[in-house]
Amino acid sequence: MVKVSICVPAYKNPVGVERLLESVKVQSFTDYEVVVTDDSQDGSVEEVVRRAEVPGMVYVRNAVRKGATGNWNEAVRHASGEYIKIMHHDDWFTDRDCLARFVEMLEEHPEADLAFCGSRQVMLDGVGNRMGEEFDRAISDEHLKMISEDWRDLYIGDYIGAPSATIYRKGAPEYEEKLTWIVDVEFYMRLLQKNPRFVVSKEPLVSIGVSENQLTESCRTDGTLNIFEYGFVMQEFSLLSEEKYRQKFIQIALKYKMPFASLAPYGIPKKEYEKAAAKKRREDFVFYVGVAKRKVREAFGKKRFT
C-alpha cells in the first residue's frame, strides 16, 4: 500500500491537469499514487496524462459521466493509499515539499483524521493560464478557535477551504452527491462529527486556480441551489435550535432575495425572518443614501455634503 493517493477528479481542462501533474512529479515525497478519473467526453485529458508519465498513475475514463461530486467519489474509490489527497484539476502543489508537509501533519498527529492548510489564490484566464495576480489566505485565529470549540460553526463559513487544501485518512465517508456548492463543508462537518480533532498549517501548501469558468462561480449566483443546500445541511446536523445557524440560513435567503416561503419547509420562524429582513432593508437604505451623497460630492466638487 502506498502512503498517499493523490486523487484528481478531472473534467476537460487539460492545461490545468498538466500543470498539476508537473507539480506532482517534482515532489520530494514520493510514496504516492495518482488517480485520475476523467469525466470528459474527449481525449484531451487522457493525452496529457499519458504524456506526463507520472510514476504510480491510475487513469480511469468514466464510461458514464458522474458529474462533479460523483467524480470526486469515483477517484477516491480507486485509491489504495493510507491517506487521501484530493487535488482538483485547477489546483497544484505550491512547491516541491508540499506533499511531504501534508503527510507530516497526519503522521505527527495520529489522533486526527483531517489536516488542512492555507492556500495561494491564483487568478486564471478562460483557458486556465495564470494571469499573474495572486495572494495567500489561511484560517484566522478567531475562526480556528471557533471550529476547534464547535465544528458545527463551519455552517457559518467554510473556514477550512477548498478540498485541495485537505488531506485525510482513508475510510472517511463519501462526498454527498446531492450537493454541489457546499459539498466540501458538509463533508468536513461529517468528518469532524466523528472525530473533532484536526491539524492545521497556515502555509500555502497548495495553489488554487480561480477563474470565472468554474462550477463554483455558477453556484455562487444560484439562490434556489443555496437554499436547498444550506437547508439540507441544517436538517442533517439538527442546527435549527440554535439562533446563529438560523440567522446564517436567513441571511442566505435575504442575499438572494428569496421569500420566506423558501425557508418555511425547514422550520425557520416567520417573525425571525421578517425581523432580519427589516434590518437588512434599513441597512441597505443607509448604504445607498451614502452612495448617493458621495456621487453628489463628486459631481459638484464639494468637500462636504449633508
Region spans (language model):
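N-proximal low-complexity "stem/linker" segments adjacent to membrane-targeting elements
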Residues: 1-23
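Short, acidic, metal-binding catalytic loop of nucleotide-sugar glycosyltransferases
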Residues: 22-31
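A conserved acidic beta->alpha catalytic loop
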Residues: 30, 38-47, 64, 88
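Glycine-rich, basic loop-to-helix element that forms the pyrophosphate-binding segment
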Residues: 62-79, 92
